[in-house]
């Protein structure tokens, strides 16, 4: 199964190519773009001040301008910022977009915003730090009562069978490696992987692992636990993770398997050892995600009896 970033194999400028590939894949995701356009059009009012966090190529900032924003503060800490500046000029938005170079938690804007928009929803929902920077923005960058796009973010987990993806972990223990790579194996076990799953990879129905209202959420870790029910015989290699999000009233988006044309992948939390499961088995799970999305811990156990 493929893992991002993908694309043609061959000599090229890796840094520029990765940036262009990544953002082009999002722009080609029509469901993603249409949903954000509808949400922004319904939320941004003429004359609003908007802050776009993780503005990337500037697409959401452009949508906000078209919705009537007086000024958009586009905050971006990556190299795509310079491309976004050029695109704003080429598309006639440069007079209404102020680009702010840096991470949103480390910069200021000259006036509080009426609307916060952002597309930093990760493959597993919370892996791009949306809780930490949203709380910071609410406290420092927004006026009281400001509106958010997205408003709400949920994460789902399900037992998954994925032989190919589990090799990302198990291959570090194979014979034939020139030295002792046990440390790499331990790190792989603690890694959230991004994979391409289908419903055929799932061994049971999903369970809600997180439901976060970004308008009110505290800057705290997500902690959750539950019980998964196995619907078919197979081998469980890990927990599959995906999200759904309420962007604005009546506008939602998700990356539930299968991906079809989605630019999002899925999250995969591997088990140390695969578990043979049968229909009717129950598995308890625990999960914790830091507000920054950098630290994930999880545990899965068979429920005996």
How should each PLM-predicted stretch be described?
Residues 2-53, 57-305:
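Class I SAM-binding transferase module
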